[in-house]
Amino acid sequence: MRTGVGVDAHKFSTDGICKLAGLEWEDANRLDGHSDGDAAVHALCDAVLAAAGLGDVGEVFGVDKPEWKGATGVQMISHLRSLIESKSITINNVSIQIVGNAPKISKRRDEAQKVLSDALGSPVTIGATTTDGMGFTGKGEGVFVIANALVQLP
């Protein structure tokens, strides 16, 4: 068994709908990013890649890879799942913690967990918190996400 940690942060834009944890959130602005800006998915991918010893999200989905421009989080997870399965690695579970004032994750937590779990083929749990007004997340400028993954190597 191996564990991996992934982190990501994105600032809010002034246009578009927020995409986070595999869902669209109309109560928050879009997150800037090369793909759809889904910081939860990026942290998830980073954690799984780290646990598997396969690099990081920048190596697999980086801004130097035009095929990932505008990609959805589910598309990224699908590619990650194929990569992991091709190495005979089993993903036991992923835990995600979203830090920010918006969107309000608790309203759709179960839905987000299902979307990400279905895409990954392994259990994904999501927690959320705020920083009580401190830092860029507390000022409502963006979100920060931490993820942990547990995998079984062949």
Question: What spans do the regions from the language model cover?
Answer:
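Beta-rich strand-turn-strand
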Residues: 118-122
